[in-house]
Amino acid sequence: MTVRKQKRFGLDIDGTVTDPATFLPYLNEQFQKTLTLEDITDYDLTKSLGITSEEFWKWMEQHEQTIYKQAKKADGVDQVLEEWKQEHELIYITARASHLEEITKNWFEQQNLPFHHIELVGKHDKIEAIRTHEIDIFFEDKHDNAVAIAETFAIPVILMDTPYNRLPTPANVVRINHWTEAKAWVDEWLKRSGF
């Protein structure tokens, strides 16, 4: 069996590569709220907003393109990804639906963020895409995704810390507060992996 020298980094986009507070100004304006990221203690935004799932998804359909076009990058992500792209494959696997592919790729280009492939799976379950792309390490903000990926593949999963994902995790889910911290952890992991 041939061992790949290059690692395949799998990355979620929303709340991981983008600032996790991206949606808040839009939600606060629409639903007359003053929520901060610290107020969002559940991934299901309907709980913080006090609205139904139907109301949320109707709003989302109307606003998602604008939000995704104007999303801010997570602090420090560009420098880290730029360095990693030199030696590793950057494969983004997102729950975004396929009709958002052009907007998503345009955003990456406008933000000067490197990518080798972007896969829009249209659902939160990313297991098959991770299997297909033979991902070596994954970056995520959604707690149950991080746990499922870690348990299914026994790979490290970097969980970008937010108030909505602070539940217990298995040992191979590593909670990180900032992209520079993620880089330091990954550098050590690469050394231990003999890279």
Curated annotation (Swiss-Prot):
Gene Ontology molecular-function annotations: 5'-nucleotidase activity
InterPro entries: 5'(3')-deoxyribonucleotidase, 5_3-deoxyribonucleotidase-like, HAD-like_sf, HAD_sf, Nucleotidase_putative
Sorted UniProt keywords: Hydrolase
Pfam families: NT5C
Organism domain of life: Bacteria
GO biological process, one term: deoxyribonucleotide catabolic process
E.C. code: 3.1.3.-
Iron-sulfur found in the keyword field: no
Similarity field: Belongs to the 5'(3')-deoxyribonucleotidase family.
Entry protein name: Putative nucleotidase BH1399
Source organism of this protein record: Halalkalibacterium halodurans (strain ATCC BAA-125 / DSM 18197 / FERM 7344 / JCM 9153 / C-125) (Bacillus halodurans)
Top-level taxonomy: Bacteria, Bacillati, Bacillota, Bacilli, Bacillales
